[in-house]
Protein backbone atom coordinates (compact mmCIF):
# COMPACT_ATOMS: atom_id res chain seq x y z
CA UNK A 1 0.00 0.00 0.00
CA UNK A 2 3.02 2.31 0.24
CA UNK A 3 2.44 3.79 -3.21
CA UNK A 4 -0.98 5.09 -2.15
CA UNK A 5 -0.17 6.61 1.25
CA UNK A 6 0.59 10.09 -0.13
CA UNK A 7 -2.64 10.21 -2.14
CA UNK A 8 -5.11 12.60 -0.43
CA UNK A 9 -8.01 10.44 -1.65
CA UNK A 10 -6.63 7.35 0.08
CA UNK A 11 -7.07 6.36 3.72
CA UNK A 12 -5.44 3.28 5.19
CA UNK A 13 -7.40 1.67 8.04
CA UNK A 14 -5.63 -1.09 9.92
CA UNK A 15 -8.26 -3.37 11.36
CA UNK A 16 -10.05 -6.71 11.38
CA UNK A 17 -13.28 -7.40 9.49
CA UNK A 18 -14.37 -9.55 12.44
CA UNK A 19 -14.76 -6.26 14.32
CA UNK A 20 -18.01 -4.55 13.33
CA UNK A 21 -16.87 -1.13 14.54
CA UNK A 22 -13.88 -1.28 12.19
CA UNK A 23 -16.18 -2.20 9.31
CA UNK A 24 -18.50 0.68 10.18
CA UNK A 25 -15.58 3.10 10.10
CA UNK A 26 -14.43 1.75 6.73
CA UNK A 27 -17.91 2.26 5.22
CA UNK A 28 -18.46 5.78 6.56
CA UNK A 29 -19.16 8.17 3.68
CA UNK A 30 -18.48 5.47 1.08
CA UNK A 31 -20.58 4.82 -2.04
CA UNK A 32 -18.84 1.67 -3.29
CA UNK A 33 -17.35 -1.22 -1.33
CA UNK A 34 -15.09 -3.73 -3.08
CA UNK A 35 -14.62 -6.36 -0.39
CA UNK A 36 -11.69 -8.67 -1.12
CA UNK A 37 -10.98 -9.49 2.55
CA UNK A 38 -10.88 -13.23 3.15
CA UNK A 39 -8.55 -16.12 3.85
CA UNK A 40 -7.79 -18.23 0.78
CA UNK A 41 -6.48 -21.79 0.30
CA UNK A 42 -8.59 -24.93 0.18
CA UNK A 43 -6.03 -27.13 2.03
CA UNK A 44 -5.60 -24.65 4.88
CA UNK A 45 -9.37 -24.37 5.30
CA UNK A 46 -9.56 -28.13 5.85
CA UNK A 47 -7.01 -27.74 8.65
CA UNK A 48 -8.68 -24.64 10.17
CA UNK A 49 -12.45 -24.73 9.56
CA UNK A 50 -13.46 -22.54 12.51
CA UNK A 51 -10.93 -19.89 11.53
CA UNK A 52 -12.41 -19.75 8.03
CA UNK A 53 -15.94 -19.47 9.33
CA UNK A 54 -15.07 -16.57 11.63
CA UNK A 55 -13.08 -14.65 9.02
CA UNK A 56 -14.74 -15.42 5.71
CA UNK A 57 -18.36 -15.69 6.81
CA UNK A 58 -18.70 -13.48 9.89
CA UNK A 59 -16.24 -10.97 8.45
CA UNK A 60 -18.20 -10.62 5.21
CA UNK A 61 -21.46 -10.39 7.16
CA UNK A 62 -19.99 -7.56 9.22
CA UNK A 63 -19.05 -5.71 6.04
CA UNK A 64 -22.51 -6.23 4.58
CA UNK A 65 -24.16 -4.92 7.73
CA UNK A 66 -21.84 -1.93 7.89
CA UNK A 67 -22.53 -1.16 4.24
CA UNK A 68 -26.28 -1.34 4.87
CA UNK A 69 -26.15 0.94 7.90
CA UNK A 70 -23.88 3.48 6.20
CA UNK A 71 -25.94 3.72 3.01
CA UNK A 72 -23.43 2.18 0.59
CA UNK A 73 -24.73 2.09 -2.99
CA UNK A 74 -22.90 -0.97 -4.33
CA UNK A 75 -21.23 -3.87 -2.52
CA UNK A 76 -18.91 -5.98 -4.68
CA UNK A 77 -17.32 -8.97 -2.97
CA UNK A 78 -14.94 -11.83 -3.65
CA UNK A 79 -16.46 -15.26 -4.12
CA UNK A 80 -14.72 -18.23 -5.72
CA UNK A 81 -14.96 -20.94 -8.35
CA UNK A 82 -14.75 -23.39 -5.44
CA UNK A 83 -18.52 -23.00 -4.99
CA UNK A 84 -18.97 -25.37 -7.95
CA UNK A 85 -17.68 -28.24 -5.83
CA UNK A 86 -17.85 -31.63 -7.50
CA UNK A 87 -20.06 -30.51 -10.41
CA UNK A 88 -18.30 -32.32 -13.30
CA UNK A 89 -19.61 -30.46 -16.34
CA UNK A 90 -17.51 -27.90 -18.20
CA UNK A 91 -17.59 -25.01 -18.56
CA UNK A 92 -18.81 -24.03 -15.09
CA UNK A 93 -22.04 -22.07 -15.30
CA UNK A 94 -23.82 -20.07 -12.63
CA UNK A 95 -26.81 -21.97 -11.27
CA UNK A 96 -25.26 -25.41 -11.82
CA UNK A 97 -23.31 -26.12 -8.63
CA UNK A 98 -22.35 -29.41 -7.02
CA UNK A 99 -21.52 -30.63 -3.53
CA UNK A 100 -18.99 -28.42 -1.76
CA UNK A 101 -15.58 -29.97 -1.16
CA UNK A 102 -13.96 -27.78 1.49
CA UNK A 103 -14.66 -25.34 4.35
CA UNK A 104 -13.31 -22.59 2.10
CA UNK A 105 -15.98 -23.38 -0.49
CA UNK A 106 -18.62 -23.42 2.24
CA UNK A 107 -17.51 -19.97 3.39
CA UNK A 108 -17.81 -18.55 -0.11
CA UNK A 109 -21.22 -20.09 -0.72
CA UNK A 110 -22.39 -18.64 2.59
CA UNK A 111 -21.11 -15.21 1.56
CA UNK A 112 -23.17 -15.42 -1.61
CA UNK A 113 -26.31 -16.38 0.30
CA UNK A 114 -25.87 -13.59 2.82
CA UNK A 115 -25.34 -11.08 0.02
CA UNK A 116 -28.56 -12.20 -1.64
CA UNK A 117 -30.45 -11.59 1.60
CA UNK A 118 -29.06 -8.08 1.89
CA UNK A 119 -30.22 -7.33 -1.64
CA UNK A 120 -33.61 -8.92 -1.11
CA UNK A 121 -34.48 -7.46 2.30
CA UNK A 122 -32.45 -4.25 2.56
CA UNK A 123 -32.05 -3.08 -1.04
CA UNK A 124 -28.24 -3.21 -0.95
CA UNK A 125 -26.95 -3.88 -4.46
CA UNK A 126 -24.52 -6.80 -4.09
CA UNK A 127 -22.42 -8.46 -6.79
CA UNK A 128 -20.44 -11.66 -6.18
CA UNK A 129 -17.23 -12.21 -8.13
CA UNK A 130 -16.54 -15.92 -8.59
CA UNK A 131 -12.82 -15.70 -9.26
CA UNK A 132 -11.12 -18.48 -11.18
CA UNK A 133 -7.44 -19.00 -10.22
CA UNK A 134 -6.26 -15.41 -10.16
CA UNK A 135 -2.58 -14.69 -10.77
CA UNK A 136 -0.37 -11.72 -11.50
CA UNK A 137 2.14 -9.21 -10.22
CA UNK A 138 2.68 -8.82 -6.46
CA UNK A 139 1.11 -12.19 -5.68
CA UNK A 140 2.93 -13.80 -2.75
CA UNK A 141 5.18 -16.67 -3.95
CA UNK A 142 6.08 -17.89 -0.46
CA UNK A 143 4.58 -20.26 2.07
CA UNK A 144 2.96 -23.67 2.04
CA UNK A 145 -0.28 -22.27 0.60
CA UNK A 146 1.15 -19.99 -2.09
CA UNK A 147 -0.51 -20.04 -5.50
CA UNK A 148 1.19 -22.26 -8.01
CA UNK A 149 2.28 -19.73 -10.65
CA UNK A 150 4.23 -17.31 -8.42
CA UNK A 151 5.56 -20.22 -6.41
CA UNK A 152 6.88 -22.00 -9.51
CA UNK A 153 8.40 -18.81 -10.93
CA UNK A 154 10.34 -18.09 -7.73
CA UNK A 155 11.52 -21.67 -7.34
CA UNK A 156 12.71 -21.85 -10.94
CA UNK A 157 14.46 -18.49 -10.72
CA UNK A 158 16.35 -19.81 -7.69
CA UNK A 159 17.18 -23.16 -9.27
CA UNK A 160 14.87 -25.10 -6.97
CA UNK A 161 12.80 -28.16 -7.85
CA UNK A 162 9.04 -27.64 -8.12
CA UNK A 163 6.47 -30.02 -6.71
CA UNK A 164 3.28 -30.72 -8.64
CA UNK A 165 0.34 -32.13 -6.69
CA UNK A 166 -1.11 -34.96 -8.77
CA UNK A 167 -0.10 -35.91 -12.29
CA UNK A 168 -0.04 -32.37 -13.70
CA UNK A 169 -2.89 -33.11 -16.08
CA UNK A 170 -5.40 -31.07 -14.10
CA UNK A 171 -6.62 -27.91 -15.83
CA UNK A 172 -7.68 -24.48 -14.62
CA UNK A 173 -9.02 -21.23 -16.02
CA UNK A 174 -6.14 -19.03 -14.84
CA UNK A 175 -7.20 -15.39 -14.74
CA UNK A 176 -4.81 -12.45 -14.85
CA UNK A 177 -5.31 -9.78 -12.19
CA UNK A 178 -6.12 -7.02 -14.70
CA UNK A 179 -9.25 -8.93 -15.73
CA UNK A 180 -10.31 -9.12 -12.08
CA UNK A 181 -9.82 -5.38 -11.64
CA UNK A 182 -11.96 -4.75 -14.72
CA UNK A 183 -14.71 -7.01 -13.38
CA UNK A 184 -14.85 -5.18 -10.05
CA UNK A 185 -15.09 -1.79 -11.73
CA UNK A 186 -17.76 -3.03 -14.13
CA UNK A 187 -19.77 -4.36 -11.18
CA UNK A 188 -19.65 -0.92 -9.53
CA UNK A 189 -21.41 0.46 -12.61
CA UNK A 190 -23.81 -2.45 -13.09
CA UNK A 191 -27.58 -1.91 -13.11
CA UNK A 192 -29.74 -2.71 -10.11
CA UNK A 193 -31.33 -5.54 -12.10
CA UNK A 194 -28.02 -7.46 -11.92
CA UNK A 195 -27.77 -7.15 -8.13
CA UNK A 196 -28.08 -10.09 -5.74
CA UNK A 197 -26.25 -12.43 -8.11
CA UNK A 198 -22.83 -14.04 -8.51
CA UNK A 199 -20.77 -13.99 -11.70
CA UNK A 200 -17.95 -16.10 -13.09
CA UNK A 201 -14.84 -13.94 -13.41
CA UNK A 202 -12.26 -15.62 -15.62
CA UNK A 203 -10.80 -15.46 -19.10
CA UNK A 204 -12.77 -18.45 -20.32
CA UNK A 205 -9.75 -20.58 -21.20
CA UNK A 206 -8.27 -23.82 -19.96
CA UNK A 207 -4.61 -24.42 -19.11
CA UNK A 208 -3.04 -27.69 -17.98
CA UNK A 209 -0.69 -27.49 -15.03
CA UNK A 210 2.06 -29.55 -16.63
CA UNK A 211 1.98 -27.30 -19.71
CA UNK A 212 2.25 -24.23 -17.51
CA UNK A 213 5.26 -25.71 -15.74
CA UNK A 214 7.18 -26.45 -18.93
CA UNK A 215 6.14 -23.11 -20.39
CA UNK A 216 7.71 -21.41 -17.38
CA UNK A 217 10.94 -23.40 -17.65
CA UNK A 218 11.21 -22.41 -21.30
CA UNK A 219 10.46 -18.74 -20.65
CA UNK A 220 12.98 -18.62 -17.80
CA UNK A 221 15.64 -20.59 -19.65
CA UNK A 222 16.00 -23.35 -17.07
CA UNK A 223 15.99 -27.13 -17.38
CA UNK A 224 14.59 -28.57 -14.15
CA UNK A 225 12.21 -31.53 -14.06
CA UNK A 226 9.35 -31.34 -11.55
CA UNK A 227 8.62 -33.84 -8.82
CA UNK A 228 5.12 -35.18 -8.34
CA UNK A 229 3.14 -35.70 -5.15
CA UNK A 230 -0.36 -36.83 -4.20
CA UNK A 231 -3.46 -34.88 -5.16
CA UNK A 232 -4.49 -32.24 -2.64
CA UNK A 233 -7.59 -32.83 -0.54
CA UNK A 234 -10.56 -30.79 -1.72
CA UNK A 235 -9.20 -30.19 -5.23
CA UNK A 236 -11.04 -30.93 -8.46
CA UNK A 237 -9.49 -32.23 -11.67
CA UNK A 238 -10.71 -29.66 -14.19
CA UNK A 239 -12.24 -26.20 -14.14
CA UNK A 240 -13.02 -23.51 -16.66
CA UNK A 241 -15.67 -20.83 -16.76
CA UNK A 242 -18.61 -19.80 -18.86
CA UNK A 243 -18.35 -16.00 -18.60
CA UNK A 244 -21.38 -15.15 -20.74
CA UNK A 245 -23.47 -13.97 -17.78
CA UNK A 246 -20.81 -11.47 -16.65
CA UNK A 247 -20.46 -10.26 -20.23
CA UNK A 248 -24.20 -9.75 -20.64
CA UNK A 249 -25.10 -8.22 -17.26
CA UNK A 250 -21.88 -6.47 -16.22
CA UNK A 251 -20.33 -5.67 -19.59
CA UNK A 252 -17.27 -7.69 -18.57
CA UNK A 253 -14.87 -8.20 -21.46
CA UNK A 254 -11.48 -9.59 -20.34
CA UNK A 255 -8.58 -8.33 -22.44
CA UNK A 256 -5.73 -10.23 -20.82
CA UNK A 257 -5.26 -13.76 -22.16
CA UNK A 258 -3.33 -16.31 -20.13
CA UNK A 259 -0.33 -15.97 -22.44
CA UNK A 260 -0.24 -12.19 -22.14
CA UNK A 261 -0.73 -12.35 -18.38
CA UNK A 262 1.94 -14.97 -17.74
CA UNK A 263 4.47 -12.94 -19.75
CA UNK A 264 3.70 -9.85 -17.65
CA UNK A 265 3.89 -11.85 -14.42
CA UNK A 266 7.26 -13.38 -15.33
CA UNK A 267 8.62 -9.94 -16.17
CA UNK A 268 7.48 -8.52 -12.84
CA UNK A 269 8.91 -11.37 -10.74
CA UNK A 270 12.23 -11.28 -12.56
CA UNK A 271 12.55 -7.60 -11.64
CA UNK A 272 11.26 -7.84 -8.08
CA UNK A 273 12.29 -11.16 -6.55
Q: Which residue stretches match the model-derived regions?
A:
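Hydrophobic alpha-helix immediately C-terminal to the catalytic Tyr-X-X-X-Lys motif of short-chain
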Residues: 110, 114, 118, 148, ...
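Conserved catalytic loops of nucleotide-sugar-dependent glycosyltransferases that act on lipid-linked
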Residues: 141, 147-148
Amino acid sequence: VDMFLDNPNYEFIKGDIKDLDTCMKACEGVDYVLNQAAWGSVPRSIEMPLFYSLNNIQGTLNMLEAARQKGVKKFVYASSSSVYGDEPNLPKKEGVEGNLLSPYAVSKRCDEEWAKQYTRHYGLDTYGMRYFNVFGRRQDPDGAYASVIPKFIKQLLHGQKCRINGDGKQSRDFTYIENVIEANLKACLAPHEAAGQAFNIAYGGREYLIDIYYGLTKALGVDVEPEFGPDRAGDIKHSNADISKAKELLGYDPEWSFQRGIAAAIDWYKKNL
